[in-house]
Structures are given as C-alpha cells and as structure tokens.
C-alpha cells in the first residue's frame, strides 16, 4: 500500500488505463500546517476513476490530559514522561487534525474546503457551480452570493432550484 507518493508518481499512475485502484494508506501528514498541499493530491485523485483517495495521517493528536507544575492544562506526549528513560515518538504523537479532546486544528478547515461537495468558481462573468456529490442533484439546495467592492456589498443574488446532476457543473449569472 503506497504512502506519501510524490505527485509525479500519482500523475503517472492516474494517466494510465488501469483497473486496479490506487489508494494511499497515508498522505497529507497533518503535523503543523503540512496539509497545505491537500488540494494538489485531491485534484490528481479526481482526474482518474482508479485513483481512490487515501487516509490523512493523523486524525487525532495522541496526547494525554495533564496538568503542569504551574497548574495549567496541556496535552502530554513523548518526552513529557522522561525522554531519557523511554523510547517515544517525540512530537509525532500530536500531529492530527483535531486535539485529543477533538478541538479542531486550523488544518481541518483546509480539509473541509478541499473535500466540499459543492464548489464555486468565477468563469468570465458567470459563477460555475460544480456538483461533487455522487447521487444528489443540487436542486434541493439554496444558494446566495454577494459581490463586494472594498468590503461593501454592492450586489446580492439568491439562487433557488439550481438543477445540476451529480458529477456535473452548471453556469449561472
């Protein structure tokens, strides 16, 4: 099972006519701000039917609820328990998209944005709406957009009943 494959390898696999799926058992390591290249992975995976996706490492920080000498709460991990005495993964224990108590880290917002089921892009003077759902038409959704100039709304429009089949896009004005 591949993990952390370079984009060139993914592009090569995606460009071939193959029947076997390609699934990354681990990708977009969430340590710090390293999920920042998630969009590139997602775009490659969506270009080919046999690119099946993968698993972001890591979902949750693996820290232990602790109170410091100063009385403040913190998530203990690795060397907090005597690095000189034990083998440990140092800060590779706290490298997830959410804290041990499931508080979201900023990187989770990037994942949410990249994985969204409905995408919008400006194409010339139209808004293109992409329906990334597998089974749901967009007609059940309501949309609204604003046009702003120097932070002030100069135009608003509501869109109701936009028909767009799964996997398709529609341009609206």
Where are these regions (language model features)?
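Intrinsically disordered, low-complexity Pro/Gly/Ser/Thr-rich segments with frequent PxxP/GP/PP motifs
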Residues: 142-173
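Extended substrate-binding grooves/exosites of carbohydrate-active enzymes
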Residues: 1-125, 133-139, 144-153
């Amino acid at each position: 099972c591949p993990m952390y494959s370079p984009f060139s390898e993914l592009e090569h696999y995606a460009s071939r006519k193959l029947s076997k799926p390609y699934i990354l058992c681990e990708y977009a390591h969430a340590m710090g701000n390293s999920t920042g290249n998630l969009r590139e992975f997602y775009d490659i995976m969506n270009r080919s039917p046999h690119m099946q996706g993968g698993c972001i490492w890591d979902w949750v920080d693996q820290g232990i609820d602790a109170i410091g000498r100063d009385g403040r709460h913190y998530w203990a991990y690795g060397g907090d328990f005597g690095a000189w005495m034990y083998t440990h993964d140092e800060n590779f224990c706290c490298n997830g998209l959410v804290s041990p108590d499931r508080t979201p880290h900023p990187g989770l917002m990037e994942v949410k944005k990249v994985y969204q089921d409905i995408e919008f892009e400006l194409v010339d003077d139209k808004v293109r709406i992409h329906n990334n759902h597998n089974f749901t038409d967009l007609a059940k959704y309501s949309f609204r957009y604003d046009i702003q100039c120097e932070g002030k709304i100069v135009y608003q429009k509501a869109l109701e009943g936009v028909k767009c089949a799964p996997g398709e896009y529609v341009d609206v004005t």
